[in-house]
Amino acid sequence: MALILTIAMSAVLLTAFIIAVYWRNVECVGEIPTSFLTFMAILFTSGLDVGLIMFPIPDFNIYANEASYAFTNPLALEFGFWGFLVWGFYFTTIFYFCIVEPKLKLFEIPLIKWTNNIVIIGTCAFSAYLFLVYLPDFIVAISDPLKYGLVGTVVLIAAASSTHIRYVKILSIGSTWLFFGLIFGMWWSGDMGLGGLASSMMNIGDYFYNINHYLAPITDYHQFYLYWWFAWSIMIGQFISRFVSGLKAWQLLGALLVVPSIPIAIWFSVLYFYFDNGMDIASIWRIAMVGVGVIFVINSLDSLMRLYTRNIGMTVERLGRLKYVASNWLIMVSLVLLYQFTPLQIEW
């Protein structure tokens, strides 16, 4: 499987390069064109999930203690799992769904259509499940009723927000600014100054020096990430392609590789400063991380709910607002509980 994944990853990235070179001046225009900044905000908040907030600290511990990762530092590894190269996946799928799919209509073939929708629904629920699993790491001694109640509330808000397209812009832009605020707050609280932040960020340079290592699974955990990026890029590519507003192919690729990677690099560098210096994250900032994580989960679930409900005709216009929200909430919560309490488990 690792060989197949390596070949697939290389093929996707090579395709991205070919598109950016040979079809570099093809303009990508979606159904609902938005400004560049709004497009990037929607991409950033829908294309990522709660893992961006909750995974880095536990991941740093893993990378620092396992021999398989000894070729570089934990910050470079975490950036390699989330930044730069992997965004080429999104470029390929956004270009496909914006330019190619309207002509080929492969995703309207019944088998492909229903397989696609099943994967979207399962992944949507798994995102909520990951939030459930990682909550105790950030809210110490959280009770089970509160934990499940919070996840159920998040799913309910996501279902409600997916009823109208205007909420996409509000959620995306708002959560982007909240994320920037979280970065600033934790930077300020850590008393690292610009020098400490810059020193921490220097570790990311090792990612580019060892970039060849990320073209194949390093470990089973890295393999999980790559599978996740592949699945996520196909789903989010369908959604995000609706909001592109006339970017040429080469501009789109450049924007995807660079723009999201900047805040990701700064965020990870702030967290790595805490980790590398043995600093505890204060309770108030852990709560803030959960708060921003909640918004990211809502964004992710919102975008995926919009996608599968549109694909299968389970729309607000057809069902009515109340039945639409209730149906989506019931589907998601049932699957989250299925992941939690039955042998239906995903290992990562």
Language-model features: locations:
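Transmembrane alpha-helical segments of multi-pass small-molecule transport proteins
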Residues: L5-L14, G83-F91, I112-A125, I139-H164, ...
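Hydrophobic alpha-helical segments and their helix-loop junctions in multi-pass secondary transporters
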Residues: V12-Y22, G51, T123-V140, L146-K147, ...
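Helix-loop-helix connectors at the membrane interface of multi-pass transporters/channels
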Residues: K113-N116, S127-Y148, F239-I262, L304-W329
